[in-house]
């Protein structure tokens, strides 16, 4: 699964 942490 790919996850993009836009909250960073």
From Swiss-Prot:
Name listed for the protein in its UniProt record: Uncharacterized protein SMPP14
Summary of the tissues where the protein is detected: Nacreous layer of shell.
């Amino acid at each position: 699964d790919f996850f993009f942490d836009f909250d960073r």
